[in-house]
Amino acid sequence: FRGAVLLDQGEFSLSGSLRINASGIVLRGVDKVKTILLKKGVDRGALIYMEGTDDLKIQDTLQVLSKYVPVNARTLEVASGTSLRKGDRILVNRPSGKEWIASLGCDIFGGGISALGWKEGDMDLTWDRTVTEVNGNQITLDAPLTVALDAKYGTSSVITYQWNGRIRECGVENMTLI
């Protein structure tokens, strides 16, 4: 944690956006009603951006072997030969295939206009997790998955990565943003 930038009470007008591009920085007001950041002008961009460097490097992609992983599960089985270790950061990816989209009725939106429906790959879900345990091909995650992984709708995957430019432990608190 680097520290907090404390803004006193008052209205602070901005003609552009604020950017936080390093880890451990908190922008803090003294009171959520009395500290106000007001963005003026015609710029429609965000008031505050928290952005690191887009240098994500995919290292390996492992197939999820579990046929069905229920909502709130924290364990899943991955392809053999895994090099995963406790503490590894991973992405769990659930594809949005045609069958899944059709099962939700989102492939067409009626009125004879099928171009508006969801397309394969448009609604893939990805969770960022940490491996807390490895037991053979079974891995345990630090947090549960919020949607089931069902092999009948496509093969999910576990992706190992390195992301040196990613920022973390940043925040905005106790202020009104307008």
Descriptions of predicted regions:
Residues 1-26, 30-43, 82, 95-127, ...:
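N-terminal extracellular ligand-recognition/capping segment immediately after the signal peptide
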